């Protein structure tokens, strides 16, 4: 029995190491991180999405600090994905269709700096892909200026536990919030 369990554990570790080589992270801010988390967790190849904060200087910020104080942080999601199943460009395209790239005040019913849209790039290739996608969107929308920030990624702080998987864990409250914000209808109007 011990030998059998040892073989199972070894097999698991080998598989995990093989998969770990294909795992990547990327970071997007798009207003309410609950809504962003829901959209990205449904994408094939995405293994996990974590709600959190990025872009500011305050270490380990809380939701109240990010929302009500000038921390410089944005509500951000960390996307953990298998690059063999979905790549950065695919995630970038999904990102655009889940935000209003022309809203400089925030996103939908959430206004303020912490709700602004931001793409955090990790290397020059990602930065170039983001810049190219912005040009394509501005062309598609007859020159309307995209106001989404492009920032170099520095640090990510996970949000409090009650924010994680909020759309699943607090399903009724989340649906009421989402309906009140009319996010889905507004996205349809922008991207149809």
Residue ranges, per PLM feature:
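Bacterial N-terminal signal peptides
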Residues: 5-15
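Flexible coil/turn and secondary-structure edge motifs
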Residues: 18-192
